[in-house]
Design a protein with these regions (language model features):
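Nucleic acid-binding interface residues in structured DNA/RNA-binding domains
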Residues: 1-119
Length: 119
């Protein structure tokens, strides 16, 4: 699978995360069909087209923390956006047991989408 296809799959997977839920980099990679691809998710997030609105703030580490420096503008923005969606952020951390996105497998497999269209 080429880089463009991987990035498209990652972006489309991220678009499926509902408000008030979060996912880890590794979880997104697995759902997008890129096992052990957490770093590729980070790469795709750094290369989102300017005209694409992506809920990037819903992607956090597997431990529930933001990947951004706690003193950075992006860290503050991520925490603010998650809080606005009803996600509790305490000391820069989200309780993954409570807020982790648990997608329905049937929906992921059978929902009409261009996600798996290789053409």
């Amino acid at each position: 699978m080429d880089r463009e296809t991987r990035m498209r799959r990652i972006w489309e997977t991220i678009l499926e995360i509902p408000r008030g839920r979060v996912a880890s980099y590794g979880q997104i990679a697995e759902i997008a069909g890129i096992p052990r691809g957490a770093r590729q998710v980070a790469y795709a997030l750094r290369h989102v087209p300017k005209d694409m609105t992506l809920p990037w703030h819903r992607i956090i580490t597997a431990s529930g923390k933001s990947a951004f420096d706690p003193l950075s503008r992006h860290f503050r923005m991520q925490c603010e956006r998650l809080t606005e969606e009803g996600v509790t952020v305490r000391n820069g951390k989200v309780n993954m047991q409570e807020f982790r996105w648990q997608p329905d497998l049937d929906e992921l497999l059978w929902k009409p989408s261009s996600m798996w269209d290789e053409s």
